């Protein structure tokens, strides 16, 4: 969700932080965000291998994934950075399927089940990010645009997740409230 939000606010964020001369980097940041949105799922699936004592599988997967990661770099050498970044997005999806395939055998939680469980969160996140991105089309100062996008995104996220009562949201909310009460 955060990576999609970052992709949605990339243009005003880059202009504010490093200036208009860096506008060509907006698309690069957005592509990198798409590549990184699966990172939590990668981490969980790899942690399962470690917890279950399958460092052998972990090592094999890392070797395979690093080998696959060479291809986007080669693409980048010949076709440019944007193609390389899109290659890294593809590599991220391939790596997720590899990681989840092997962890699924260990915990009886298939890739399809994982996707089915995270699909509602991704759907809501994509929708909210799309609404946030629409604000980047307005011809207003980036100093108004960025805070507006962030406020709209946070408000929508809170309202939609409160309404849908998704288990993932409820768990994050419970943990957040618990941390606040400890202080």
Task: Tell where the protein language model's regions lie, with residue ranges.
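Alpha-helical transmembrane segments of multi-pass membrane transport and lipid-handling proteins
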Residues: 1-39, 70-71, 75, 126-129, ...
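Short runs within selected transmembrane alpha-helices of multi-pass transporters and secretion channels
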Residues: 4, 27-73, 77-105, 149-154
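Short helix-capping/hinge motifs at transmembrane helix termini and TM-loop junctions
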Residues: 9-14, 18-22, 53-54, 76-81, ...
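Short helix-terminus and kink motifs of transmembrane alpha helices
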Residues: 11-15, 43, 47, 166-170
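A generic structured-segment signal
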Residues: 15, 94, 101-106, 114-118
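Short, amphipathic, aromatic/basic-enriched membrane-interface segments that mark the entry/exit
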Residues: 51-61, 111-119, 142-143
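Hydrophobic membrane-spanning alpha-helices of multi-pass integral membrane proteins
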Residues: 64-68, 118-133
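Membrane-proximal transmembrane or re-entrant/amphipathic helices at the cytosolic face
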Residues: 104, 109-111, 118, 131-183
């Amino acid at each position: 969700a955060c990576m999609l939000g970052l992709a949605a606010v990339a243009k005003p964020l880059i202009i504010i932080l490093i200036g208009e001369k860096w506008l060509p980097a907006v698309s690069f940041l957005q592509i990198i965000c798409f590549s990184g949105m699966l990172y939590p799922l990668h981490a969980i699936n790899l942690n399962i291998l470690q917890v279950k004592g399958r460092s052998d599988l972990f090592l094999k997967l890392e070797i395979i994934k690093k080998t696959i990661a060479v291809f986007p770099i080669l693409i980048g050498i010949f076709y440019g950075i944007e193609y390389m970044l899109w290659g890294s997005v593809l590599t991220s999806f391939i790596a997720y399927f590899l990681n989840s395939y092997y962890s699924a055998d260990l915990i009886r939680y298939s890739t399809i089940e994982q996707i089915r469980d995270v699909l509602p969160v991704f759907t809501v996140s994509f929708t909210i990010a799309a609404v946030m991105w629409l604000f980047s089309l307005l011809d207003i100062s980036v100093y108004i645009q960025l805070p507006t996008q962030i406020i709209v995104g946070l408000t929508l996220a809170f309202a939609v997740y409160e309404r849908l009562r998704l288990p993932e949201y409820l768990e994050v909310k419970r943990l957040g409230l618990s941390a606040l009460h400890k202080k």
